[in-house]
């Protein structure tokens, strides 16, 4: 039985939806993919936090009913999202497990940008800007940017392939602050070997690049 984890990709229904959207866009509204996305709409609505930002890219090729269904789901999703984000003063999804949460913060910043583009009357630009502010220094413990070489002060000792040199890779983004339960935020500035705080991960960096470009577009 297929199980999604780490390098295996996401849930099969998620991957099917992503592929359908990409093929719809690539074929400029190909009928098989429009039909499939209509069939997948219940999946998109159920897993909106993962799929909503992807599904809105299909709107130009779908009927008005598809867009209105996404809008209704987005309104419900936003109520729960705002409730969750209000639990900390930064207004972002801070991780409370054993891994720093910079990736999920950058991902939310990027995802909400796409939702803002499609539904500016429902989603504002503040989610994207708050997310970028967080990874660049507005976070617990310090004001050090999680992105090496980006920001006035940035993480210059990290878990990359040169970690034994206590060095860094420009542009790499670390996971960041870990909340040691119940309430102690930790980020070691000078010890690179705690990978759950300091490891560079490729998809995290690409997510930051997407979020940074989104914030730049909003600021123009």
Q: Language-model features: where?
A:
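Flexible helix-coil transition and linker loops at the boundaries of alpha-helical arrays
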Residues: 1-7
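Aromatic (Trp/Tyr) and acidic
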Residues: 13-43, 50-86, 95-220
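Short hydrophobic beta-strand that contains or immediately precedes a catalytic carboxylate
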Residues: 89
């Amino acid at each position: 039985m297929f199980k999604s984890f780490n390098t295996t990709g996401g849930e099969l229904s998620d991957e099917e939806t992503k592929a359908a959207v990409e093929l719809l866009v690539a074929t400029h509204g190909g009928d098989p993919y429009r039909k499939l996305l209509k069939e997948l709409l219940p999946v998109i609505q159920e897993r909106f936090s993962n799929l909503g930002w992807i599904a809105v890219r299909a709107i130009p090729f779908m009927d008005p009913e598809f867009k209105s269904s996404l809008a209704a789901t987005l309104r419900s999703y936003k109520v729960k999202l705002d409730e969750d984000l209000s639990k900390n003063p930064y207004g972002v999804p801070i991780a409370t497990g054993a891994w720093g949460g910079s990736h999920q913060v950058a991902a939310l910043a990027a995802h909400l940008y796409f939702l803002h583009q499609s539904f500016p009357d429902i989603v504002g630009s503040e989610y994207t800007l708050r997310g970028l502010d967080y990874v660049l220094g507005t976070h617990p413990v310090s004001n050090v940017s999680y992105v090496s070489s980006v920001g006035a002060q940035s993480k210059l000792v990290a878990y990359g392939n040169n970690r034994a040199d206590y060095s860094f890779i420009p542009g790499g983004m670390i996971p960041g602050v870990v909340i040691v339960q119940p309430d102690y935020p930790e980020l070691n500035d000078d010890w690179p070997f705690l990978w759950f705080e300091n490891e560079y991960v490729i998809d995290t960096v690409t997510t930051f690049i997407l979020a940074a470009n989104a914030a730049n577009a909003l600021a123009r």
